[in-house]
């Protein structure tokens, strides 16, 4: 009996030790750090920087395209590069969800270019989800935006399904209460939501996203002269759905606080833009960022850091794709 008791105790101890080692291993795999690639791919940041600089110079809309792509990847189910995966005969991927069909190709292209360069320098080492996170940060800096640290060590998802994102991304016509609920469900405050909305200070929107509101004689919040200009710019949009207008008509290629200065003047492009100023829960932050660019930059940087950590995969929960557009 004594021997059986000792054997039982020894078995329990060994089991606990195994569980402890597994927990430690998982914790080590799950840890994100800013210097994650310092030994495995020491030129990681230099390669990213060179790639995005060349792309931004040749195509100035790249920063806005990559920023939108990053949000559409992270916000629904986490920063796992699932939006980069192409559809197959057996699966409709996220990028082919109706809400993602208008994502500009330059955002995808800059990530693919960076991945190609990194695979030559450090094969099977850097995840696509880390590439897009750093590329977006560096692209924003090139157009005047704030610098912020990015923790690294993400893995890429092994799945990408259109059905998993359809109702999880904000729409241009969405009411503020619905927007607040969406952001809140992912742990973002009202102020963080407004700060992230400042991403509209660069980029463009297709006419179909706002033309139903363009009428110089109605009270949709547009400056009348702006409404006339929009109506003219989008006059042929039914025949050419690719026609678009800059989100910030004053400084469209510069990351600044002009977006927030425009909204009170009736120069916000989307219904959700107007809603930020008309709703008492969000208006104080619009006014704050309109008069204080430094505060906007600080809050935007913090919100982007938080977004970059949303739902990340680490260790054995994900993979490092050989190609960003295809699961291994």
From Swiss-Prot:
Gene3D superfamilies xrefs: 1.10.520.10, Peroxidase, domain 2
Residue stretches in coiled coil: none
Cofactor stoichiometry and binding remark: Binds 1 heme b (iron(II)-protoporphyrin IX) group per subunit. Binds 2 calcium ions per subunit.
Keyword terms of this UniProt record: Calcium, Disulfide bond, Glycoprotein, Heme, Hydrogen peroxide, Iron, Metal-binding, Oxidoreductase, Peroxidase, Secreted, Signal
Uppermost EC category: oxidoreductase
Keyword Glycoprotein carried by entry: yes
Annotated positions binding Ca(2+) 2: 201, 248, 251, 256
Domain of life assignment: Eukaryota
Chain positions recorded as heme b binding sites: 200
Signal peptide bounds: 1-27
Binding of Ca(2+) 1, residues: 73, 78, 80, 82
InterPro entries documented for this protein: Haem_peroxidase, Haem_peroxidase_sf, Peroxidase_pln, Peroxidases_AS, Peroxidases_heam-ligand_BS, Secretory_peroxidase
Positions annotated as active site in the UniProt record: 72
Gene Ontology CC annotations of this record: extracellular region
E.C. number: 1.11.1.7
Family stated for the protein in its record: Belongs to the peroxidase family. Classical plant (class III) peroxidase subfamily.
Designated name of the protein: Peroxidase 63
Organism field: Arabidopsis thaliana (Mouse-ear cress)
Gene: PER63
């Amino acid at each position: 009996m004594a021997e059986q008791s000792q054997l039982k105790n020894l078995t329990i101890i060994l089991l606990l030790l195994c569980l402890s080692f597994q927990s430690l291993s998982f914790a080590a795999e799950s840890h994100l750090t800013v210097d994650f690639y310092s030994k495995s791919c020491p030129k990681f940041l230099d390669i990213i920087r060179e790639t995005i600089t060349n792309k931004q110079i040749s195509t100035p809309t790249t920063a806005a395209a990559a920023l939108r792509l990053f949000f559409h990847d992270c916000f629904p189910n986490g920063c796992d590069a699932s939006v980069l995966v192409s559809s197959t005969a057996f699966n409709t991927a996220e990028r082919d969800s109706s809400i993602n069909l208008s994502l500009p190709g330059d955002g995808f292209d800059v990530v693919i270019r960076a991945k190609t360069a990194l695979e030559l320098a450090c094969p099977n080492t850097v995840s696509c989800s880390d590439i897009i996170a750093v590329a977006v940060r560096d692209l924003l800096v090139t157009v005047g935006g704030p610098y912020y640290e990015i923790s690294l060590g993400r893995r890429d998802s092994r799945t990408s399904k259109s059905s998993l994102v359809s109702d999880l991304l904000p729409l241009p016509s969405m009411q503020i209460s619905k927007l607040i609920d969406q952001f809140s469900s992912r742990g973002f405050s009202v102020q963080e939501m407004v700060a992230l909305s400042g991403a509209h200070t660069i980029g463009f929107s297709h006419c179909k996203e706002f033309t139903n509101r363009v009428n110089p004689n109605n009270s949709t919040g547009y400056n009348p002269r702006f409404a006339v200009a929009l109506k003219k710019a989008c006059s042929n949009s039914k025949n050419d759905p690719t026609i678009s207008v800059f989100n910030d008509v004053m400084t469209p290629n510069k990351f600044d606080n002009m977006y927030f200065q425009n909204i009170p003047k009736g120069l916000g492009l989307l219904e959700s833009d107007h809603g930020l100023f008309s709703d008492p829960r969000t208006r104080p932050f619009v006014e704050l960022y309109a008069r204080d660019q430094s505060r906007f930059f600080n809050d935007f940087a913090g919100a982007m850091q938080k977004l970059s950590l949303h739902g990340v995969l680490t260790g054995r929960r994900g993979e490092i794709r050989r190609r960003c557009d295809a699961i291994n």
